[in-house]
C-alpha cells in the first residue's frame, strides 16, 4: 500500500512537471522578423513619406510601437544581416562588406567570406528549443550559395528555406534564382515580395501545428533592380516626378501589400494572438544613379544625413516597428518611442522571451529589450559601434552612446578603403589611430549639422576615450581571412 501511494505521488509530480513545461512552451511567442532591403528612413507613410501609401505598416505601428532611433548592424546588406541573426557585430564574424558571388578567387580573399559555422543565430537557438523555423527571401550571408564549400541557411537553424544569394534576378519581376531547401526553384511568375509572401503563407499552413515558430521574411524590395506591378505604378504617376520614381513608390507599396497578406494569414490560422512581429530594414536608402541599375533608387533618408554606405545617420538609422498583439502594455500601444534600439538586440530579446539561456562565453553586442516591451526604461550599458572600412564618407568609425553620435576618421583618412580584412590588412586596422573626432547631439540635431567636438572639450575627451576602448575591443576580436 505504501509503495502504491509513493508511486501515485511520484506520478502526480511527474505529470505536474510535464504540464508545467507544456504550459511554458505554450506561452512562448511565435516570432516573425520582417526585413526590407535598402528601405529609406523616410520611405514609409508612418515615417513621413508624402506619397507612398503603407496602410499595413501604419496599422502595425498604430497597434504597436514605432521607434525613431532604431539602428541596423551595418550601413550595407551582408554585415547587417549577419549582425541581425547573431546579435554580434559583423566585424567579429568577419563580414565587413556586401558579399559577392564567389565566381573566382580575388586578391583580398573576398570570395571566401561567409558567416562561419561557429556562429549561432536566432534560428539556431529557437530550433534547438523546439521551434519550427523558416527563412524566405534574401540570404546574402555567404559567397558560395547552395554549394558544399560553405554553410547554408539550414546550418544556421532554418529547417525550411526559400532564398536567393543576393538580389532577386533578373529583377523583382519573375525572379528565376530562388533556391528551396537546396534545390533550384526555377522561374517563378510574379513579383519578388509576393513570391516571398506566398512561400511564407504556405509554410505557415503546412508547419507542425503544436510548435511555436520563427519566420524570417527578408524582402528584396526596394533594392535595385526595381520592378513593380503596372497597376500600382499607375497609382503613383501623378505623385512622382518620373516613371522611374513611380516604380520605386510602387515597389514599397507592393511590399506593404505582401506584409498585409502574411498578416491576414496569421489571423486566418489563429496565430496572430501570440506572434511578436518586428519590422525593420538592413540599412538606409541607395543613392539614385550611383550605378546603372540604381536608376530607380528614389529612397528617402528623411531628415537624416547621408545614404546607404555612409556612417552618418541615414546609413544605418532605419524604420523599426514592433507589434505584439495583447502582450504590449496598453500604455505603449500606438506610441512613438525614442529609445535607442538595434537589430543586434533581436537575438538576446527573442531568446529571453523564449525562456532560453545563452552561453556565458557568447560575446554579444546587442542588449535584450524585453524590459522595454514590458513598459520599463531600457538601460543600454554598451554603446553601439560601427566600423565600415569602405564607407563613402571619410569617417569610417561611428558610435551611438546615449544622445551622442561620434564619428572618427582612421589615420586622418589615409587608411585605404577595405572591402575585406585579411591577415595582411589586420595589423593596419589594429594599429590605426582614431582622428578628426566629430560629436553630434542627436536629441537636438538629428541631421548632424552642428559638430560640437570643439565646443564641449570635457564631453569630447570622455566620448573619445570611450570610442577608443570600443574600437580596440572590436578590432582585436575581428576575424581576418
Regions found by a protein language model. Give the residues of each.
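Formylglycine-dependent sulfatase
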Residues: 21-438, 446-481
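Bacterial N-terminal signal peptides that target proteins for export
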Residues: 1-11
Amino acid at each position: 500500500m505504501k509503495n502504491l501511494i509513493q508511486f501515485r505521488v511520484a506520478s502526480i509530480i511527474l505529470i505536474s512537471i510535464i504540464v508545467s513545461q507544456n504550459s511554458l512552451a505554450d506561452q512562448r511567442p511565435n516570432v516573425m522578423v520582417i526585413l526590407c532591403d535598402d528601405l529609406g528612413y523616410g520611405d514609409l507613410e508612418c515615417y513621413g513619406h508624402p506619397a507612398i501609401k503603407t496602410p499595413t505598416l501604419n496599422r502595425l505601428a498604430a497597434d504597436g510601437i514605432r521607434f525613431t532611433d532604431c539602428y541596423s548592424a551595418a550601413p550595407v546588406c551582408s554585415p547587417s544581416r549577419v549582425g541581425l541573426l547573431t546579435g554580434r557585430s559583423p566585424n567579429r564574424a568577419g563580414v565587413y562588406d556586401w558579399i559577392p558571388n564567389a565566381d573566382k578567387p580575388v586578391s583580398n580573399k573576398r570570395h571566401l567570406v561567409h558567416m562561419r559555422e561557429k556562429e549561432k543565430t536566432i534560428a539556431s537557438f529557437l530550433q534547438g528549443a523546439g521551434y519550427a523555423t523558416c527563412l524566405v527571401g534574401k540570404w546574402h550571408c555567404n559567397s558560395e550559395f547552395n554549394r558544399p564549400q560553405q554553410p547554408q541557411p539550414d546550418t544556421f537553424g532554418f529547417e525550411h528555406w526559400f532564398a536567393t544569394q543576393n538580389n532577386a534576378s533578373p529583377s523583382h519581376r519573375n525572379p528565376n534564382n530562388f533556391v528551396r531547401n537546396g534545390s533550384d526553384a526555377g522561374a517563378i511568375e510574379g513579383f519578388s515580395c509576393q513570391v516571398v509572401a506566398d512561400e511564407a503563407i504556405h509554410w505557415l499552413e503546412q508547419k507542425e501545428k503544436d510548435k511555436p515558430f520563427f519566420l524570417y521574411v527578408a524582402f528584396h524590395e526596394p533594392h535595385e533592380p526595381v520592378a513593380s506591378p503596372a497597376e500600382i505604378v499607375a497609382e503613383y504617376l501623378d505623385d512622382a516626378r518620373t516613371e522611374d520614381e513611380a516604380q520605386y513608390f510602387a515597389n514599397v507599396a507592393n511590399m506593404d501589400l505582401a506584409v498585409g497578406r502574411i498578416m491576414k494569414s496569421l489571423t486566418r490560422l489563429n496565430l496572430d494572438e501570440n506572434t511578436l512581429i518586428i519590422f525593420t530594414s538592413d540599412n538606409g536608402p541607395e543613392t539614385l544613379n550611383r550605378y546603372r541599375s540604381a536608376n530607380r533608387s528614389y529612397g528617402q533618408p528623411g531628415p537624416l544625413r547621408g545614404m546607404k554606405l555612409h556612417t552618418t545617420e541615414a546609413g544605418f538609422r532605419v524604420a523599426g516597428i514592433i507589434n505584439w498583439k495583447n502582450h504590449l502594455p496598453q500604455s505603449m500601444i500606438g506610441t512613438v518611442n525614442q529609445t535607442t534600439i538595434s537589430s543586434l538586440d533581436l537575438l538576446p530579446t527573442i531568446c529571453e522571451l523564449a525562456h532560453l539561456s545563452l552561453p556565458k562565453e557568447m560575446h554579444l553586442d546587442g542588449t535584450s529589450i524585453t524590459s522595454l516591451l514590458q513598459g520599463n526604461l531600457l538601460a543600454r550599458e554598451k554603446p553601439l559601434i560601427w566600423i565600415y572600412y569602405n564607407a563613402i564618407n571619410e569617417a569610417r568609425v561611428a558610435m551611438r552612446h546615449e544622445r551622442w553620435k561620434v564619428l572618427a576618421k582612421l589615420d586622418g583618412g589615409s587608411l585605404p578603403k577595405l572591402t575585406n580584412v585579411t591577415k595582411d590588412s589586420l595589423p593596419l586596422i589594429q594599429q590605426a589611430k582614431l582622428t578628426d573626432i566629430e560629436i553630434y547631439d542627436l536629441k537636438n540635431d538629428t541631421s548632424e549639422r552642428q559638430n560640437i567636438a570643439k565646443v564641449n572639450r570635457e564631453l569630447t575627451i570622455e566620448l573619445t576615450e570611450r570610442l577608443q576602448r570600443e574600437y580596440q575591443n572590436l578590432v582585436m576580436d575581428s576575424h581576418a581571412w
